Amino acid sequence: MTSDTEGSRAFYCQVFGWTAEEPAGEFGGYVNFTKEGIRMTGCMASQPGSGVPDVWSVYLATEDAEKTLAAAATHAGQVHVQAMAVGDLGTMAFVTDPGGAGIGLWQPGRHQGFGVLGEPGAPSWFELHTRDYEAAVGFYRTVFGWDT
């Protein structure tokens, strides 16, 4: 989410060599970035005056967004965006973990997720900084089945 869509488009295209697609009207002006024709990430404008800072969001894959939302809510997470279809691309939702970190959920449709890995400009690592380590570890183990 950004307060300067045009500036963000120019920045990421120049720094990472991405190409910005034209904003998709049916998705509220959402901009997809591609690398060599493969979708990498997206960008949307924040609401003016919302006080929300510019921020990146990470989406974790799930086979069933509704089931994962229920598990998150049961294990001290908060649901902020209920599962919703994003055209035929997939289904998204958004939660915060017990420490307050935001995390998106992505149930793939036509868009499976990252198509480019291990190259400059491609995602390579995500790291959680949390106020409540034990609660966060328990949440991700239980909700997503992760080992730590």
Feature roles, as predicted:
Residues 1-3, 31-33, 47-71, 73-128, 148, ...:
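Vicinal oxygen chelate
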Residues 42-49, 58, 80-81, 85, ...:
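DNA polymerase sliding clamps and clamp-related checkpoint/processivity subunits
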Residues 39, 54, 102:
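Glycine-rich acetyl-CoA-binding "A-motif" of GNAT/NAT acetyltransferases
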Residues 38-41, 60-63, 79, 122-126, ...:
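Short, low-complexity, polar/charged sequence segments that are solvent-exposed and flexible
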